[in-house]
Amino acid sequence: MRIRRRDEKENQEYKKGLWTVEEDNILMDYVLNHGTGQWNRIVRKTGLKRCGKSCRLRWMNYLSPNVNKGNFTEQEEDLIIRLHKLLGNRWSLIAKRVPGRTDNQVKNYWNTHLSKKLVGDYSSAVKTTGEDDDSPPSLFITAATPSSCHHQQENIYENIAKSFNGVVSASYEDKPKQELAQKDVLMATTNDPSHYYGNNALWVHDDDFELSSLVMMNFASGDVEYCL
């Protein structure tokens, strides 16, 4: 009972809050003379009104000459980010792999800088991707899909010809299918995609007329769909 009351009395006498320069000097002198460990003896040996845990953390996180108090470098930031992906918020394990940094330093730097930086980079990447998706395609070529080409191949040229102004229409009825597939390719220039007719449309810029004969033969036969 007496021991418990004595411990409670000592706990009530412990000082909390910011450390003073005088307290730091007392702690450093003790560690230099007696080494680390047995932190609870500091109160009895020096009269310092700090608990053993507070003394240990003060030494490890601030007073130790092994602690790097400078700004974090880009290499350290990259290392912490990669370690955090593997270990999560296990700051002690991360700090052991970052020389000169304590777990408290790493945790504080992550919460105040790196986490916000990563969120900002992700938002910028999403915004850039969204802007790119909104831009119209420079070349759009479609033909009847394989599932519909059987029903639409007979009138594909007539439908395309009706959907554009100033387009030269190929007379499908007067020519054999093989001749149409090899020679009659219908192209129209327009900047307005609203002139599309269903899935059977050809939209290119004025400078993009050089298409290979093989591509155009496939387009005429309705076997493939091109969207570049």
Swiss-Prot record:
GO terms for cellular component: nucleus. Its main location: nucleus. Residues 39-63, 91-114 bind DNA. Keywords: Activator, Developmental protein, DNA-binding, Nucleus, Repeat, Transcription, Transcription regulation. GO terms for biological process: cell fate specification; fruit development; gibberellic acid mediated signaling pathway; jasmonic acid mediated signaling pathway; regulation of protein localization; regulation of trichome morphogenesis; trichome differentiation; trichome patterning. Expressed in leaves, stems and flowers. Expressed in trichome cells and in leaf primordia. InterPro entries: Homeodomain-like_sf (IPR009057), Myb_dom (IPR017930), Myb_TF_plants (IPR015495), SANT/Myb (IPR001005). It is found in: Nucleus. Induction: Up-regulated by gibberellins. May be regulated by GEBP and GEBP-like proteins. Gene3D superfamilies: Homeodomain-like. Changing C149R: In strain: cv. Aa-0, cv. An-1, cv. Bur-0, cv. Can-0, cv. Es-0, cv. Gr-1, cv. Hi-0, cv. Ita-0, cv. Kas-1, cv. Ms-0, cv. Mt-0, cv. Nd-0, cv. No-0, cv. Oy-0, cv. RLD, cv. Tsu-0, cv. Wassilewskija and cv. Yo-0. Pfam families: Myb_DNA-binding. Residues 11-63, 64-118 form the HTH myb-type domain. Disulfide bonds: none annotated. One of its GO terms (molecular function) is DNA-binding transcription factor activity. It comes from the Eukaryota. The keyword Transcription applies. Homodimer and heterodimer with MYB82. Interacts directly with GL3 and BHLH2. Part of a complex made of GL1, GL3 or BHLH2, and TTG1. Also interacts with BHLH2/EGL3/MYC146 and BHLH12/MYC1. Interacts with MYB82. Transcription activator, when associated with BHLH2/EGL3/MYC146 or BHLH12/MYC1. Involved in epidermal cell fate specification in leaves. Together with TTG1 and GL3, promotes trichome formation and endoreplication. Regulates the production of a signal that induces hair (trichome) precursor cells on leaf primordia to differentiate. Binds to the WER-binding sites (WBS) promoter regions and activates the transcription of target genes. PANTHER family: TRANSCRIPTION FACTOR MYB8-RELATED-RELATED, TRANSCRIPTION FACTOR WER-LIKE. This is Trichome differentiation protein GL1. It comes from Arabidopsis thaliana (Mouse-ear cress).
